[in-house]
Amino acid sequence: MTSFVLASASPARLAVLRSAGVEPIVRVSGVDEDAVIAALGADAAPEHVVTELARAKASDVLPVLARDGISDAVVVGCDSMLLIDGSLQGKPGTVDVARARWSAMAGRSATLLTGHSVLRIAEGAVVGDAHDHSATVVHFASPPDADLEAYLATGEPLQVAGAFTLDSLGGWFVDRIEGDPSSVIGIGLPLVRRLLAEVGVGVAELWASSGRVD
């Protein structure tokens, strides 16, 4: 039996997988994202940055799986960042940063990049490695100050890439998107399907499982 592992603490990613019929085993990555970005260098392409972060997260949980006795697994790691004005933005962390970002992106469009990494593990060894990124254009509304302050006060935008969500309160302030909605939420089902195929796993194998594929 091969376990299906999500290398992320994101409730949104878990919800996407569950709504698509998959109940993964969750093992949270402890990757130092700033260190990974610094190692890539200032000239690294934004698409490369999010993809390498996703790869680092997937790889980081492998020792945990070995410790837990999980030697056959499909591991999925993801990382999302918002590209606006040539700059990549992750989680704002504070109300002031989130407010400044909304001031810059209100009424405009930006690109949400999500890196994806799929590792196939058999008998404790990596036997398949597929990775890529998705890019979705997000068109933002211009929320009134009162609505924006109320949104900031919820704390939701502080811990999500780009200071917004599509599937929760932030969805009120997104006019439309061009691309895959699940990628904006944090894990793109179309891309994961393709990457799983590259490592020899079909999505239909996952539907009837609870954290495992035959």
UniProtKB/Swiss-Prot annotation:
It is found in: Cytoplasm. It comes from the Bacteria. One of its GO terms (biological process) is nucleotide metabolic process. Keywords: Cytoplasm, Hydrolase, Nucleotide metabolism. The active site is at 79 (proton acceptor). Its main location: cytoplasm. It catalyses: a ribonucleoside 5'-triphosphate + H2O = a ribonucleoside 5'-phosphate + diphosphate + H(+); a 2'-deoxyribonucleoside 5'-triphosphate + H2O = a 2'-deoxyribonucleoside 5'-phosphate + diphosphate + H(+). GO terms for cellular component: cytoplasm. Gene3D superfamilies: 3.90.950.10. One of its GO terms (molecular function) is nucleoside triphosphate diphosphatase activity. Its cofactor is a divalent metal cation. Its EC number is 3.6.1.9. Nucleoside triphosphate pyrophosphatase. May have a dual role in cell division arrest and in preventing the incorporation of modified nucleotides into cellular nucleic acids. Belongs to the Maf family. PANTHER family: BIFUNCTIONAL DTTP/UTP PYROPHOSPHATASE/METHYLTRANSFERASE PROTEIN-RELATED, BIFUNCTIONAL DTTP_UTP PYROPHOSPHATASE_METHYLTRANSFERASE PROTEIN-RELATED. This is Nucleoside triphosphate pyrophosphatase. It comes from Rhodococcus jostii (strain RHA1). The lineage of its organism: Bacteria, Bacillati, Actinomycetota, Actinomycetes, Mycobacteriales.
